[in-house]
Amino acid sequence: MNIGAEQALLGAILSNNQAFEKIEDFLDADFFSSKINKLIFESIKKLITNDQI
């Protein structure tokens, strides 16, 4: 996948928790090609699931 697309997706789910709810069943960290984007995704996922953002 394109790094820019990965970053756009991360930005979308970070700014809109409902976007995460729509993709959480089929998207996981392995979807991301960049290691840093995988870590960012896991962090966002943890924050959203724990109602911290």
Indicate where each model-derived feature is located.
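Noncatalytic partner-interaction/assembly domains of nucleic-acid and motor enzyme complexes
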Residues: 1-53
